[in-house]
Amino acid sequence: MAWFFAPEPVMVTADEALKGGRHTVLENPAPHTVLGTPVTGPWKEGQQRIWIGLGCFWGVEQMYWQMDGVEGTSVGYAGGFTPNPTYREVCSGRTGHTEIVEVVYDPSKISLEQLVARGLEAHDPTQGFRQGNDVGTQYRSAYYTENEEGAARVKAVVDAYGETLKQHGFGEITTEIGVISPSEYFLAEDYHQQYLDKNPDGYCPHHSTGIPCGVEA
């Protein structure tokens, strides 16, 4: 009997990536269907942003818009090379992007660490280029911030959780942590925005390890 296995996903290089360069995929997006807030701003004074990738972005966005202190969410793509990518292009693995949720929050009501911890608990950050049966570089675990100070705070939470996971027999965390500018986050098509509000019977499972992160709420 022969066994056939799909090759492991490989991250595309900048030279290999699709060139893109077209107009923005989603221009003039409608307000958030749940929160009623603008998807692209203007933001209130004091609001902050973080970009989070935990696999399929439909369920991740719903999880975050339900959190107290979160005042805006959208879904899109970041971490790659191709400007203004389409969903189909991202799914090809030839853009370098991962599926991302932009979270706009009030730091006086919820901390960056709490947002990071909630994400870590909602997926398996040791799976590399996959989450469950969703396989590809576009499903990799990632946190992107607007500055190095934010990235350092994210790394502290991720590193601590990595030690906890090791104590429970898990491998190394593969979460990508970086700094991006807002212009490096590309909105996904309208169809994907607040998908599980528009499609209540839609399916997008989380792949939690079941191990708590330990960050105080």
From Swiss-Prot:
Source domain of life: Bacteria
Alphabetical keyword list: Oxidoreductase
MF term (GO), any: peptide-methionine (S)-S-oxide reductase activity
InterPro entries: Met_Sox_Rdtase_MsrA_dom, Met_Sox_Rdtase_MsrA_sf, MsrA_MetSO_reductase
Keyword Nucleotidyltransferase carried by entry: no
Keyword Aminoacyl-tRNA synthetase: no
UniProt catalytic activity: L-methionyl-[protein] + [thioredoxin]-disulfide + H2O = L-methionyl-(S)-S-oxide-[protein] + [thioredoxin]-dithiol; [thioredoxin]-disulfide + L-methionine + H2O = L-methionine (S)-S-oxide + [thioredoxin]-dithiol
Single GO BP term: cellular response to oxidative stress
Catalytic center residues: C56
GO cellular component: cytoplasm
Gene3D superfamilies, alphabetized: Peptide methionine sulphoxide reductase MsrA (3.30.1060.10)
Family classification: Belongs to the MsrA Met sulfoxide reductase family.
Function recorded in the entry: Has an important function as a repair enzyme for proteins that have been inactivated by oxidation. Catalyzes the reversible oxidation-reduction of methionine sulfoxide in proteins to methionine.
NCBIfam families: msrA
Protein's name in the database: Peptide methionine sulfoxide reductase MsrA
Organism of derivation: Corynebacterium melassecola
Gene: msrA
